[in-house]
Amino acid sequence: MKNRNSKICTSLFVLCLIMHFAALAQKKLTVLANKPVAPVAPTMWGVFFEDINFGADGGLYAELVKNRSFEFLNPMMGWKELKQNGKGKTLIINRGNEKPANPRFARITVDSAQYGLSNEGFRGMGIQKGKQYNFSILAKKGDGNINVMIELVNATGKKIGSTSLSNFSGEWTKQTASFTTTDTAVKGRLNVLFEGNGFIDVDMISLFPQETWKNRPNGLRADLVQMLADLKPGFIRFPGGCIVEGRELQNRYQWKTTVGPIEDRMSIMNRWNVEFRAPRNAPDYFQSFGIGFYEYFQLAEDIGAEPLPILNCGMACQYNTGEVAQMDQLDPYVQDALDLIEFANGAVTTKWGKVRADMGHPAPFNLKYLGIGNEQWDEQYIERYKEFEKNLQQKHPEIVLVGSAGPSPNGPRFDYAWKEFKGSKAGLIDEHYYQSPEWFFKNATRYDNYDRKGPKVFAGEYAAHGKDDTVTESKNTWFSALAEAAFMTGLERNADVVKMASYAPLFAHVEAWQWRPDLIWFDNLRTVGTPNYYVQKLFANNKGTHVIQVLQDGKVLAGKDSIYASAVLDKTSGEVIIKLVNAATAPTSYEISLAGVKLNKNRATIEVLTSPDAYAYNTLDQQKNIYPVQKTMGIKGNNINVSLPPMSLNVIKVSIR
């Protein structure tokens, strides 16, 4: 009897296994490859830059000297005196209206000895061995004869590079010198030593690596720009973000003060300087505007992205002062928008087109999009937006205007904004979502039922905010990236409504951050892509030209069995690209049938991004904990059999005829 029962149990177990695997084998997906639903905008996946987390000065901008023109609130911040064997002193002089954008300079007095200033850089200076570095200084000779010695030293004070300057003029003159380093330093310092007897006036003390992006003198940090270029973004939104608004209107971002000669750009305090308490406060966080609107346009052109500038609409940050410009005093703000279009697109014979040409770019930048306000809300915003719209539509109807739906993805402010914008000329409405990973999974169908005839959506700032630990990069977990991937299948599936999308924020220095998670982390010498970065890259590098449907049992797959799907046809490359997210903790198998097309090869490729640990993350020391792996797959007829690993993003590419 026991043997019989045992055989029955064994048979039932085997039958269950057969039924289980048969059920797995019966999971089928159909991709309607010959029935494009909607075009995918070339701007679909882009990047959003804001000068937060030392993303510009100390980051993307390759300048190594902090407070190079003595314009911080404390003019000697970042500098310390070096006294050797004698007397010397530094006097900060403010020349006021003589040079209002850069009024301060330092008068260095030396008394028969060596006296100097040492600059600490941005959490130190990252120096690479055997590389050329370019030093420059604006100087005017006073009494006596002064020579200048320039030294780079490492954290222990050892000299790793040096040069010198002499024969200064009695007029303000830029002097330059270059040298090659003998060692690497993560936290180097620059020493500027003055020798002789007398005094000399100095300003704009600067040090750049020779190797910048495209080797432009005094340009951008090459490795950080390369991370952006590798994303192949369709657009770049700049310069923010909350710095567009400022804590008060006086501190707002004004693009006209960021163009022209570097020494004539007016530095201001970065609003993230005072936004958070210790340890995230940053009293040394200012904006030199070495990256200004010209450099942003140039960067967009370099990486093949549409420029999307955002302008202040006469409102300061509503989370801070919330002050607004009176409606009868809004004209200067509107004029800034009109002048920006002229700067970007105008002929060289126009006032602002000539400024662009004089900076080295006579050809227009072909600006097509313009954002009015960053993250504003309520009646005061809509009233001001409409004033911009009236003027811009009349004079530049070719420009697509971007309005704000406020800081939240739902609620009374959000609903009010959308109600008002549906009767406007806004081409895109900027929606922001900083939410939990669970929210992103739940909202993968958010745009399935949006109005197809209303303004289009710009998913301008989003990031899943989940678990973290004490490690700086730990907020960027695989679970948060996986949630974003699931949500992005919904954005792609609704590409007729969603025309732009960008993760935020973009950059963060590991020792100088105010906000996390962030897409790309860096220190003075290294950079690392987060799991979220590789999700963005897999979508942006596989954008396609037209949306096609992925169906299971005739229905869209958006959360059933924790699977999320979208697909595109790329008419340019002749490929079908299928994106599948398995958010479950177990593997899942599918048979995928491509309907209406013939496959060009008997193999497909699949890129898989996954981790067995939902809360794993990449760090500067372990950069590929979560990293895409590419493999080939077999094809049988028009079918592909695929096994999706647990907690994975899978991108399948098939060549078609």
Model-derived segments and spans:
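Solvent-exposed strand-to-loop "edge" motifs in beta-rich extracellular domains
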Residues: 138-143, 180-182, 541, 581-583, ...
